[in-house]
């Protein structure tokens, strides 16, 4: 997805959130704040973007958004239980209506047989208690994996929670 397409998607998300009087927060690891950056590229995004958390280290995940050390130790940072706790923690800390969390292995190193480079977990949560998780495996270099993860996060937020609702 091009920068222009990411911006267009972010504008769609923003318009839908603004129409609802709702806000979103992000908790990002492998994307390093890219989702928050794309969101804040839109003029007026302060009306619907509460804040973003870049929780690259396990310590940051625990300190900033309350991911339990036991969860990190048992499942690893790139796992469904961790992204769920990231989304819930960000939602609570920001008092937002929607949360998006992302943790993955962008490469070129760090992959394993169980979690190859390109593996990314996503969680989406709402203040109403709804939530979904997804695991994707993207291809390409580090930049490509991170760009695809950013696009996927925005597309899923739009399609699953904001479009036609």
Curated annotation (Swiss-Prot):
EC number(s) given by UniProt: 3.5.1.42
InterPro entries in UniProt: CinA-like_C, CinA_C
Pfam families membership: CinA (PF02464)
Swiss-Prot/TrEMBL catalytic activity: beta-nicotinamide D-ribonucleotide + H2O = nicotinate beta-D-ribonucleotide + NH4(+)
GO biological process, one term: pyridine nucleotide biosynthetic process
GO molecular function terms listed in the Swiss-Prot or TrEMBL record: nicotinamide-nucleotide amidase activity
Record keywords: Hydrolase, Pyridine nucleotide biosynthesis
Primary role: Has NMN aminohydrolase activity, not active on other substrates.
Subunit-level organization: Homodimer.
NCBIfam families: PncC_domain, PRK03661.1
Family of the protein in this entry: Belongs to the CinA family. PncC subfamily.
Stated name of the protein: Nicotinamide-nucleotide amidohydrolase PncC
Organism: Shigella flexneri
Lineage of the organism: Bacteria, Pseudomonadati, Pseudomonadota, Gammaproteobacteria, Enterobacterales
Gene: pncC
């Amino acid at each position: 997805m091009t920068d222009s397409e990411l911006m267009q998607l972010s504008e769609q998300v923003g318009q839908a959130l603004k129409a609802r009087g709702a806000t979103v927060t992000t908790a990002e690891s492998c994307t390093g704040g890219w989702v928050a950056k794309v969101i804040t590229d839109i003029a007026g995004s302060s009306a619907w973007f509460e804040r973003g958390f870049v929780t690259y280290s396990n310590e940051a995940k625990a300190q900033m958004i309350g991911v339990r050390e036991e969860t990190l130790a048992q499942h690893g940072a790139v796992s469904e239980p961790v992204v769920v706790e990231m989304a819930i923690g960000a939602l609570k800390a920001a008092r937002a209506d929607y949360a998006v969390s992302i943790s993955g292995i962008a490469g070129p190193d760090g992959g394993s047989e169980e979690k190859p480079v390109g593996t990314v977990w996503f969680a989406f949560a709402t203040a109403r208690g709804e939530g979904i998780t997804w695991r994707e495996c993207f291809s390409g270099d580090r930049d490509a994996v991170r760009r695809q993860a950013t696009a996927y996060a925005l597309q899923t937020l739009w399609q699953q929670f904001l479009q036609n609702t």
